[in-house]
């Protein structure tokens, strides 16, 4: 009789323990901040007490987004998805990733996880040596609007990394239909150079290597701020800087709060166009652009030009500006591959 009572007690305790262990959590339980970005504004990573699963929140992941929030829940240790959760679900760490932007590749490379990439968009334009070395085994799924979903499905991805331009990616609905989880990466929207790089921490979380990602990122602000201080202590003066070339009859000038304007300031320069304090580039006419260029000490990011002769051919009127005459014209295309892929738009995100 005592043995039967003891057995019944053991069974009851076992059932009670199992019930507590498997009790479904609620999404509001995931309020423990695991990583709060210091420089980026578009994401955070949260957990819950006693849970190994995490919740990644991505805010306003495309231009013009207002109060848009997306979520990725990463299930770990056999835990359940919270009741009523309507976001994306990744079961375990991502081992097979399709990266739709070259910056995603650079971030995964920076944390030592580039070999998780099994699919890309536009492989010919990618600079990363590991991707090019494995190009025969990596699927090029094409570009948004013309995605090869049959190939994408055959890659058996755990996760697809997306980006939005002026709205949600057109891939969303098809990926949901195929039951392939996705996550938006909004690095390009960050105005801080360090904020862009900090998105590598998000990618380290989806691969189960957040500690590694935090360590890799931590070295970047140290190096960046040391260079910034060195420039600030310099007595070489503050050159005024003109940007870009015309697009049709307009010349687009970035905001003073933009990524490139901040790079200029941190490098000891003065961005010449101070009128645009908004959050997007604005067009000016060619006459105003000429007046700005005439006052500039340097001219950066001159489109497809590889030489002063190229620039002269595309902008003949601007050849009498001081920066042109002095040869103080610089482009960002020193590392361009044979297909025209520019590493500035790839690895520069993790090397500000």
What are these regions (language model features)?
Residues 1-26:
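Bacterial Sec-dependent N-terminal signal peptides
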Residues 142-147, 165-169, 190-197, 210-214, ...:
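Soluble non-cytosolic domains of exported or imported proteins
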